[in-house]
Amino acid sequence: LGLGFKILALVVLILGGYLIFNAFITKSRALSFSLNGGENADNDHQETLFWDLKKPIKIKITAPKGIKRYALKVTTKDDLILYEKENLVLDKPKSLEVPLIKPEIMGLEDKCLDYEVHANDWSYANFFNGNKAFFKQEVCVDTIKPSIAILSRSPSIAYGGSAIVIFEALDKNLSQAFVRVKKKDFKAFRLLEFKQRNIFIALVPWSYENKDFKAYVVAKDKANNSNATPLLFKRKTHHMREKDIDISALKDKILKQEIFQNDIEQTLLEMLSHARLKDLEKIQEIALKQGDFYKDFSDFQALKPLNEPFKMTNNFLERRRFLKDDQVLFQFSHLGVDLRPGKDLSLVFDPIIKRVFEGKLDFYGNSLINCYGLGLCVFLAHLKDDKSVGSSGLKLESGLHLGMLLQGVFVRPNEWLNEQWIKTHIIAPIEQAKRLLMKG
């Protein structure tokens, strides 16, 4: 064979070998992209980003072989190039954050742009150009904060009580709306009758843990623009009653209860200081999670938990002090009311309720939690069973213990037992809001 043929064969062999080697070292996912330090992103499942042009948005490029070069290109939807630049990276970093360039031309508010990033690594793939990758992200500019219109609200709110607000959040890119009381946020539910608009309804508690009440309706959009409007109610305070309970006077009553097998004083303090708090934490957690569903309150009726008229005793937030030789051993606020029935001890349940808990608690004994929607739940304790009043748990008073929770916060039960209060503070504001909405 001639020399020329041998050279040609050698070239073909070298070229073929390199092509095989190049195919082996070229990898489709040698480089990856992520947004603002999040999980890896790809072009097939990438959601639109909304940008207020304030908080920086960064695309992170990751390459185990080191990043060789990257290019950033910004275009409008009609293919007008706003920015284009390529950068060579000599120090071979394995990761690099590329900040998105803010558009410098006017009139882009409410417009969407395409950001494209091309990158290569320092590998020998692609004829020594390195592995390459491409990422495209749609970014919509939104610098306008949502506006809030309060349609109606309860005329007042009492310390430890409840109120309602119906409002509209105006923003086509709205992401969430809620009510903030102090530093705690309470969910607002969409009013389903007006799905085409961002109409929300929220039951608002004045927590007994806060001596004053300051609330705002808050709306945020997808670009993280936010707005807050003060929620103004006439505020009502209540005088808190106190009740002294002498431990020695309880002995005859509590000795009959099976939980008192050992020292009465020690067991009582243990139940009050630990078991009760543990039960309350569990009750609040269940009510907060399980009461989180929408329900129409337009025809909400006062709670009637017993089969016959009852007498309300031992008020909400009554301060109970347990004494021994005139010394206070323990004290707490009563987070409910006690209802004293007549001869009929049967429980009555509204058909609209959702039973979310039925079981035995250490302090409260056999208990039920039923929820009505919008975060409102009722807690019934010291029951005989799920159908009647009893004396299970540590029961210090006769009758039915009833507590109300609003998004996990204990509130005044007497309000929800009062038909007139419900008409004035709940139903009337709902009707007023609907009339305004029907007018357009």
Feature annotation, model-predicted:
Residues 16-42, 129-147:
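Proline/serine/threonine-rich low-complexity linkers at boundaries of modular beta-sandwich domains
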Residues 37-50, 152-158:
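Short beta-strand segments of immunoglobulin-like
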Residues 102-112, 205-212:
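Surface-exposed, short loops/turns at beta-strand junctions within beta-sandwich domains
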Residues 154, 161-164, 169, 174-318:
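Non-catalytic extracellular/periplasmic "stalk"
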Residues 296-308, 326-360:
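Short, glycine/small-residue-enriched coil/turn segments at secondary-structure junctions
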Residues 312, 368-371, 388-433:
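Conserved, short, structured surface segments that act as functional micro-motifs
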Residues 348-386:
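Zn2+-dependent peptidoglycan hydrolase active-site motif and core
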